[in-house]
């Protein structure tokens, strides 16, 4: 092992359940700085951040950053929906703000991923996170031409911006899925 990177979630006002607060972010950076000093010459320690498109934190000041999207904005309600946590939120997003068309929500999500890719993150996180709560196909058909077209368009944006793709095992590890992100389009 020559290099080890740590990555915390950036702060977002919209959803504080999974992200570091500003004070925790400062503590995180200080802890990583101590580890860098402690392991200097043995292992390169890197300090990273998973920066959500709605984050209020800066992407600078880290050794690398991982770009991500976790929310969809509903034009009808003015709400931001976290698409990977509560099934009811995804349901409400689809029916209250995408006129009951789940693939319209999917297309909007992948458009958000394209926006993140355009910012040229070092790594693009869980590019198809919207499928997390859809293991049984209860919300949308992951094999539909619209789903695949939106996913492939986001993938092309990632490629065009030289983004590395994260292979994320979180959905499997936590029992939501049997497959990783990204899917095998």
Features from the language model and the residues they span:
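A metal-dependent hydrolase metal-coordination microenvironment
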Residues: 1-95, 99-107
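Domain-core and long-helix interface of multi-subunit machines
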Residues: 66-74, 78-185
């Amino acid at each position: 092992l020559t290099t080890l990177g740590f990555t915390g979630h950036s702060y977002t006002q919209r959803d504080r359940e999974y992200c570091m607060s500003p004070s925790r972010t400062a503590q995180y950076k200080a802890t990583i700085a101590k580890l860098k000093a402690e392991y200097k010459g043995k292992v390169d320690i890197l300090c990273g951040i998973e920066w959500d498109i709605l984050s209020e934190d800066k992407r600078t000041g880290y050794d690398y950053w991982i770009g991500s999207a976790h929310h969809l904005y509903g034009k009808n309600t003015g709400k931001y929906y976290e698409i990977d946590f509560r099934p009811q939120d995804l349901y409400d997003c689809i029916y209250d703000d995408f006129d009951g068309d789940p693939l319209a929500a999917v297309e909007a999500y992948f458009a958000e991923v394209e926006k993140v890719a355009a910012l040229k993150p070092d790594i693009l996180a869980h590019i198809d996170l919207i499928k997390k709560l859809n293991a049984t196909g209860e919300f949308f058909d992951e094999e539909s031409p619209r789903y695949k077209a939106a996913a492939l368009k986001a993938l092309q944006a990632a490629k065009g911006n030289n983004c590395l793709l994260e292979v994320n095992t979180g959905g499997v590890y936590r029992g939501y899925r049997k497959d990783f992100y990204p899917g095998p389009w």
